[in-house]
């Protein structure tokens, strides 16, 4: 007997989460206050990167806390990459911070990721031009059209179906989870059973924005254009290619 959650179960759980378990935004402010008061790094760019990674970890911990409260566990597992073909829309700021994170990695790992990205953009050039031209503002079918082309995320290692920047993967990736049978993702390009904690994104971006403003007038070149990079959103592959 398979007692996995159904779509109907998820509708009820979703309602419960929305009514009772939306986290307090103050948690995100407390995190940035702690970093600003006790920074592990000295330079402004390093503190911003430290904040970026800390806020992403906070998103993960908040999701786990909600899961505990409503007694659910994701059926996602390492090596399952169906959602890694979804359109990831993010800010230019986040794309820049992901690249800064890669730059901070050990030399061998850093070179491996950059070589992977260059190969990715070269081998998927025509498909990327096609999918990144889909208007996600105006076209209600943009997600389906994008997924139908089966262009993987720039950071997906297709040999292992794992993420090369898992620790700093964008919020659409880390907030999208399946709690029903794992087959639902295999059987549909856009399964209705999946759940997104996208409400956490606003808390995270607001807190990150607050930290940026702390360092706007520092002498150090942060490589960030404020506020443009915060508000400019586009497909992740397009932003990464422009910033490489």
PLM-predicted stretches and their roles:
Residues 1-244:
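Short loop/turn segments that flank or connect secondary-structure elements
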């Amino acid at each position: 007997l398979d007692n996995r959650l159904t779509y109907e179960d998820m509708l009820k759980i979703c309602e419960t989460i929305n009514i009772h378990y939306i986290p307090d935004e103050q948690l995100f402010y407390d995190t940035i206050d702690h970093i600003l008061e006790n920074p592990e790094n000295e330079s402004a760019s390093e503190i911003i990167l430290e904040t970026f990674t800390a806020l992403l970890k906070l998103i993960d911990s908040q999701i786990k806390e909600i899961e505990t409260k409503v007694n659910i566990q994701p059926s996602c597992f390492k090596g399952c990459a169906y959602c890694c073909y979804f359109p990831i829309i993010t800010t230019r700021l986040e794309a820049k911070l992901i690249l800064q994170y890669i730059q901070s990695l050990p030399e061998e790992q850093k070179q491996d990721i950059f070589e992977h990205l260059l190969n990715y953009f070269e081998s998927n050039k025509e498909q990327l031009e096609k999918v990144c031209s889909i208007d996600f503002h105006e076209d209600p079918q943009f997600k389906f059209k994008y997924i139908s082309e089966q262009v993987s995320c720039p950071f997906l290692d297709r040999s292992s179906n794992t993420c090369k920047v898992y620790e700093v993967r964008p919020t659409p990736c880390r907030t999208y989870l399946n709690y029903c049978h794992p087959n639902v993702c295999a059987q549909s390009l856009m399964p209705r059973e999946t759940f997104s904690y996208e409400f956490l994104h606003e808390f995270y971006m607001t807190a990150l924005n607050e930290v940026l403003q702390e360092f706007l007038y520092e002498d150090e070149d942060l490589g960030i254009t404020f506020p443009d990079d915060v508000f400019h959103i586009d497909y992740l592959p397009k932003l990464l290619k422009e910033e490489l």
